[in-house]
Design a protein with these regions (language model features):
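A short beta-strand-turn-helix
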Residues: 45-70
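Short pre-active-site segment immediately N-terminal to redox-active cysteine/selenocysteine motifs
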Residues: 68-71, 75-79, 122
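Extracytoplasmic/secreted proteins, especially bacterial periplasmic and envelope-associated proteins
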Residues: 44, 48, 71-74, 85, ...
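N-terminal targeting signals for export/organelle localization
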Residues: 1-50, 159-165
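Thiol-based oxidoreductase modules, predominantly thioredoxin-like and allied folds used
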Residues: 75, 86-113, 120
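C-type cytochrome heme c attachment motif
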Residues: 78-85, 125
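Non-catalytic, surface beta->alpha helical segment in thiol-disulfide oxidoreductase systems
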Residues: 122, 127-165
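Loop/turn elements at helix/coil->beta-strand transitions in domains of secreted/extracellular proteins
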Residues: 68-71, 99-101, 131
Length: 165
């Protein structure tokens, strides 16, 4: 008798739990989303790089940036400790500077030909691509303040007095 009562109580509890869970999901789906999803870093393949950043195969002797906004390109590897250190910084910067710059990521393990074309020998290597100018390269992990300074001065061309530290 005790086993039957226990089984009935467990069944009732399970049904109640699933019924309550389902109502929450329905109400969440019916609510309009007020949260605006901000852009994060964009992972590039070689083909995407050639279309969005620079077609070095078509113009091997001249740098011609194809983007409509300045960008940072992070050449990284998934096993690299310093790469993992700057990944959340780049994620934050992509949100902070959304609409002003692009932040691209190129996995050097998967895109070896692309990394070789730029002579990437150590990672992370960062390529800062301003509009209408030659890109600038930096190697190694940097603190967020250095990224902010480079973005403001190199990419967005803000004078030092206008840059907040």
């Amino acid at each position: 008798m005790k086993k039957i009562i226990f089984a009935v109580l467990m069944l009732a509890t399970t049904i109640t739990a699933f019924a309550g869970d389902n109502k929450e999901k329905k109400s969440e789906n019916n609510k309009p989303s007020k949260e605006i999803k901000k852009m994060g870093p964009i992972h590039l393949t070689k083909a995407e790089f050639l279309a969005k950043v620079a077609n070095y195969e078509k113009n091997p002797t001249e740098w011609k940036y194809l983007g409509d906004k300045p960008c940072i390109i992070d050449f990284y590897a998934s096993w690299c400790g310093p790469c993992k250190t700057i990944a959340p910084i780049l994620e934050d910067l992509a949100k902070e500077y959304d609409g002003q710059i692009y932040i691209y990521k190129v996995n050097t393990e998967e895109e070896q030909e692309l990394a070789g074309a730029f002579g990437i020998r150590s990672i992370p290597t960062l390529l800062f691509c301003p509009m209408g100018e030659a890109p600038q390269m930096a190697q190694g992990a940097m603190p967020k303040s250095s990224f902010v300074q480079a973005i403001n001065e190199v990419l967005l061309k803000k004078p030092k007095a206008a840059v907040k530290n």
